[in-house]
Each structure stands twice: as structure tokens, then as C-alpha cells.
Amino acid sequence: IIGGMIAGTHGEHVISGYGHYAGLISIDDERVLAIHVDGVGSKVIVASLAKRYSTIGIDCIAMNANDVVCVGAEPIAFVDYLAVRSPDADMIEEIMKGLAQGAREANLSIVGGELAVLPDLLADEFEMSKGKGKGKTRGRGKVKERVDNAFDLAGAVIGIARKDELILGESISAGDVIVGIASNGLHANGYTLVRHLLLSRYRLDERIDELGSTLEDELLKPTRIYVKPVLDMIRSMDIHGIAHITGGAFKKLTRLNSNVRFVLNSMPEPPSIFKLIKMHAKIDDAEMYSTFNMGIGLCVIAAKGDEDAIISICKNHHDMDAYVIGKVEEGKGVYVNDIRLV
């Protein structure tokens, strides 16, 4: 229903709209604008609880720029929307530092933004599952956690591409190779589950042996920005498809092409945070690989034989680990280690 309503607004300049990683607007015979909007989700609650705001802006840039580059567009401009319960100058400055750092990493310009003060809309407390959090033993049920200043953060990005260089997934075919580029932890998805699951058991400032760090250090790792290595790939070889592994995780591969089968049979060992989540949540692999990135933040699909060049660009030029994680076959769906996700 929503898709139909949106499609009904499309004029002659719209090339691709609802459903892909970015909306595409023709601006002349050769070039298109790619437009995308996204937020950081409930990761902002963790930042509020920890009173640590310096990396959340990186997440906001990453969630937008990574999606635009998936269609072969170079992100060039960004605007942000920051809503706060009260105008805390120090907090706002820290958030803006992260946005500026993310913009530099993505090589784009922040050209505008909006600051909204919304005390009646943003809560100053959040419902949490009961448990040990804060070092106190609690009973079953729910408790409230208070924060000094709730906020929300979102943004929109514009990218530009040549029409003949768009990457929309139509050229993906059986025999192609799938290369996965490593993530930097959870990135910005699954935080509602993680917050209720882990903060009921651990304090944010508690060091967890399985992680080798405090919980807040792990949960506030910024989303990795893949713009520069992907643009290097696009400029040097024929890339058939790119998937940013966010909400929906590996099921998102079908967004690229629903007429082939994506077989992920060589996935790396998941990082410790995902093992910790699985242990406490007691959910199976199908659910994990449908919810979390499991250590792979971006999938790049190309002809067999190009995998070494893709991995070299990531490792040698951008210090990112990358692996061959699977292949494309005839059929339909997404499979991880023989488990069908969709």
C-alpha cells in the first residue's frame, strides 16, 4: 500500500524510487541524483544512557552514505536533523563532531541541518527489562531508566552518478562471487533487542570478558563507512551489486536481484558481541543472520575472478578486512550455511 502511494507521486524524472537503497532522479541525459534518508535508531538511547555522544554522528553519516554508494553514486552533500529534549550545548557539540568526522570519512559536505527542541515529544526515561543492570538485583518485569537529555538523530544524503554506471543488481548472475567487507560490531541495527537483552544483565561501564571491553565501548563503536573503498572498486572494475547489511541483515540481498540465489557458505566466525547476544537471547542462526550483520557490513557482488582485486582494495588501501563469503547460483532466496533466510 505504501509503495503504491509513493509510486503515485513519481514524475518523469524518477528512475528508481521506493524499495532500493536510494531514490534516483534524472537531472540530464547522462547524470542522476541519488537521494536517501536514514537515522541512527535506538542506538541514540545507549549514547544517552552512557552520556557519550562523540561517535553517534558517524553512525548517521554511515547509515546514509553507505546506502547511496550501493547504487554506484558518489555521496556529495548531507543535511542532518537533530531533535533534543533540551538544548545542551556540550552534547550538541559532541554530536556535531561525530557528524563532521563521518563527513570527512565519506568525503562529503554537510550543507545544512535542523535543530529541534522537543521536550514534550522526547521522553526522559526508557523502559528496560529487569535484571542486574546498574549493579542492582531486580525482579521480573520492567523498570524505567532515566537519561539527562534524550535526543534523536537523522539525516539525508545526495549522491551523483552517471546513468551508465548505476549499480542496481540486474547484472548479477549465477557464477558471481560474493565478497564481504568486515563490520565494526553491531553498527546501528538491532539495538532495541540488544538494549533490553544486555542492559538487564550488565552495566554499561562493566567490563565483559567475552568482549575484552566494557559494554558501552562495544555498543558505541561507530558504523564503518565504506564509501572510499567502494568508489575505488567502481572506478576500476565491473561491480554487479552492493548490499549494505543493516535492518533485515542478509535478507536484503534480495533487494538487488530476486531472480537468483545468494549462497553464503563461507562466512567468517562472528565477532564476540554476536555470540554474547545469541547466548542470552537463545535464538537460532536463521534469526541471527536475519537481524544482525554478524561481522559483515557490506556485500560486494562481481564476476568470479575479480574477488582478489576487491579484497586488495579493502585491505591494502583502506585497512578493512574482506573475504569471499559465498556465490550466486540459479534459483531464488538467500541461504547461510544451508539455512534459508528468505
Where are these regions (language model features)?
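N-terminal glycine-rich phosphate/pyrophosphate-binding loops that anchor nucleotide-derived ligands
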Residues: 1-69, 107, 118-121, 142-143, ...
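Glycine-rich anion-binding loops of enzyme active sites
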Residues: 27, 32, 40-44, 59-60, ...
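Acidic-glycine-rich active-site phosphate/pyrophosphate-binding loop
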Residues: 28-41, 169, 204-205, 267-278
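Glycine/charged-rich beta-loop-alpha catalytic/anionic-binding loops adjacent to active sites
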Residues: 39-52, 80, 210-214, 282
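Alpha-helix C-terminal capping segments
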Residues: 66-74, 255-256, 302-303
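Glycine-/charge-enriched secondary-structure boundary and capping motifs
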Residues: 91-109, 115, 121-153, 201-220, ...
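Acidic, glycine-rich loop-and-beta core segments that form the ion-binding/anion-interacting portion
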Residues: 174-213, 217
